[in-house]
Amino acid sequence: MMPALDDTAIRGELRRAEPMSRHTSWRVGGPAEFLYLPADVDDLGVFLRNLDKATPVFWLGVGSNLLVRDGGIRGAVIAVQDALGDIEDLGDGRVAAGAGVACTVFARHCVRQGLGPAEFFAGIPGTIGGALAMNAGAFGGETWNQVVSVDVLDRAGNVSTRIPDEYEVAYRQVDGPAGEWFLGAVFGFEENFDTSMEKVKALVNERKEKQPLGLPSCGSVFRN
């Protein structure tokens, strides 16, 4: 059992024995010992600082392709979709996006601003945080090809900004400083890029033709 947490120190919502089936695309999974919905980045830092250092921490975006056992998750699950769900245009083709932003939402935003290549994000079923963690990609594009910088958080609640040179990035793999998690990133794109919402819709429709997006699904499965 997770050691007692001082609820008065945090502003977000702390749920106990939360069924993970409510938070995954597969609609299966036992209870998380604790699930925390932080109010914002500062509150997230306070939560981590007050959390016992022996308590495992897991991060949750939209729960795409996340399989949780019936026995649930021991430790703290942190759901970031709301607290880290902002997108901000910075100018000169740069866009900041929080780790909780759905990749499809990010794709549409960038295309509306005439920025690219960004339409490939529409083919990624998760959030920006997950895309950063594994260098997710689709339709020939990869997340880290567009990264200018990332904001990260450590277990002590400290926020830092890092650049791509501080990471080893490969196909569906990202290795960087230990004990840090992605809060979001600044992405760089070409302005007045030749793309359209129709292309984004076409990519989404291509996914729909291959996968039952409206039903609990594990997406594509490959046998090597």
List where the protein language model places each region.
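Conserved beta-strand segments that form the floor/walls of ligand-binding pockets within enzyme
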Residues: R27, A96-G98, E119, A133, ...
